[in-house]
UniProtKB/Swiss-Prot annotation:
Record family assignment: Belongs to the tRNA(Ile)-lysidine synthase family.
tRNA processing among keywords: yes
Name by which UniProt lists this protein: tRNA(Ile)-lysidine synthase
Pfam families: ATP_bind_3
Length: 426
């Protein structure tokens, strides 16, 4: 019986405890209705949550009416919300499918906290898992993407992964439970529906049991992934430092590109980018690779990883405090790099700060000849990202201080100094 199989699966996968409160995602379709009926009949404490995305006109409102009647019939508390999905997708510049997913799961999490539910139960089943495997395979994926849908992801649990779509329909027929049909599921409109309606039937002509074969493969790969992920995690301790990914240690691994994929793919880098990053490991420093939120920079010995933040090029990322005082025989020049001392009379033009630029030069303190700032930073073994964040304090057109590093010898304190100006980073 379906109900007993689902209960055994819940216990086997440790999805939740008998006394836990469940928030069931209820669209009104066959899968979610079956999930609610199975859990409610089994005695679990359920509340339901329904989203009206207003994407299918009257159909969307029909679905809402149906779930209201269903929950009222069985005395199940129902939470309902409305979304302007099209507007959200336009504002976020994402697909309608992605917009609906983000809106749905963000709201589910909010309702879960408000009602005190322990988990959010969603109605993915074996056929969904097969379609996910194929979808990821077509798009390009690593071993994790070939595992299909997993029983648990944080607070999201999937009790129906032990049964398929055909069994769900048969269960609903046996208990005399109706449901609503989403017309888009019958149209060749979205990628997943192309897999469901076109690709899988072709595969079944070759192997009528292809769905079962893929589920068995997924279960086998799950065991393989456990070993694989353990090896990747161990490698991370050798390769990743607070500064970045050590290129020499990475190249000592048997499969550097696989390691890069598992590290960078979750950060939004696609397979082609990761291959380019792997090819850059033996090249010159300076190459940059960008995902939506992250940047990888090929430096001399490291791959630098940093989040992309919009920067105000005209505003210092720290504060400078200025102090002016008489120069006396007992004055001691501070040694900290965060502090710079100048002869006040030599700072005789407008003082301003900016990012250093290509071609900038200064005379480092204690020297007599000019040096390019780019060469100075290279000699100091600054990484590319550190160079990009370096600011200078200028007196007119001349650089007086490579901030936090070294002052210019032309503004030094000497025996003729009467007043000193001190700048300090805070």
């Amino acid at each position: 019986m379906i109900q007993q199989r689902v209960i055994r699966y819940i216990e086997k996968e440790h999805l939740f405890l008998p006394d836990d409160k469940l928030l069931v995602a209820l669209s009104g379709g066959a899968d979610s209705v079956a999930l609610l009926r199975v859990l409610h009949t089994a005695g679990y404490q359920c509340e339901a949550a329904h989203c009206n995305f207003h994407l299918r006109g009257e159909e969307s409102n029909r679905d809402e009416r149906f779930v209201r009647q269903l929950c009222q019939k069985y005395g199940i508390r129902l939470h309902i919300t409305d979304f302007n999905t099209t507007q959200y997708a336009t504002e976020k510049r994402i697909s309608i499918e992605m917009a609906a997913r983000e809106l749905r799961y963000n709201w589910f999490e909010k309702i879960k906290e408000e009602c005190g539910a322990h988990v959010i139960a969603v109605a993915h089943h074996q056929d969904d898992s097969v379609e996910t495997m194929l979808f990821n395979l077509i798009r390009g994926t690593g071993i994790t993407g070939l595992l299909g849908i997993r029983p648990r992801n944080g607070a999201i649990v999937r009790p129906l992964l032990c049964i398929n779509r055909e069994e769900i329909i048969r269960y609903l027929q046996q208990i005399g439970q109706d449901f609503v049909t989403d017309s888009t599921n019958l149209e060749d409109e979205y990628t997943r529906n192309k897999i469901r309606l076109n690709l899988l039937p072709l595969m079944q002509e070759i192997n009528p049991s292809v769905k079962n074969s893929l589920i068995e493969t997924s279960n086998h790969l799950n065991d393989v992934a456990t070993i694989y992920n353990k090896v990747i995690d161990e490698a991370k301790t050798r390769i990743i430092t607070p500064e970045g990914i050590r290129i020499d240690a990475l190249l000592d691994e048997p499969a550097p590109e696989a390691f890069l994929f598992e590290t960078l793919h979750p950060l939004g880098f696609n397979s082609a980018q990761i291959k380019d990053i792997a090819n850059s490991l033996h090249g010159q420093p300076g190459k940059q690779f960008v995902s939506k939120e992250w940047r990888v920079i090929k430096d001399r010995n490291l791959l630098l990883l940093e989040t992309i933040r919009p920067e105000d090029e005209s505003t210092l990322p720290y504060q400078l405090i200025k102090e002016e005082r008489e120069f006396t025989p007992d004055f001691r020049i501070p040694r900290e790099k965060e502090t710079a001392c100048f002869d006040a009379d030599k700072l005789n033009e407008e003082i301003h700060c900016r990012k250093w630029q290509a071609g900038d030069t200064f005379i480092p303190f204690g020297m007599t000849g000019k040096k390019k700032i780019s060469d100075y930073l290279t000699d100091r073994k600054f990484s590319i990202s550190q160079k990009e964040r370096q600011w200078v304090l200028c007196c007119g057109e001349r650089i007086a201080w490579l901030i936090g590093e070294r002052t210019d010898n032309r503004f030094r304190i000497d025996e003729t100094t009467k007043r000193v100006i001190i700048y300090k980073i805070v």
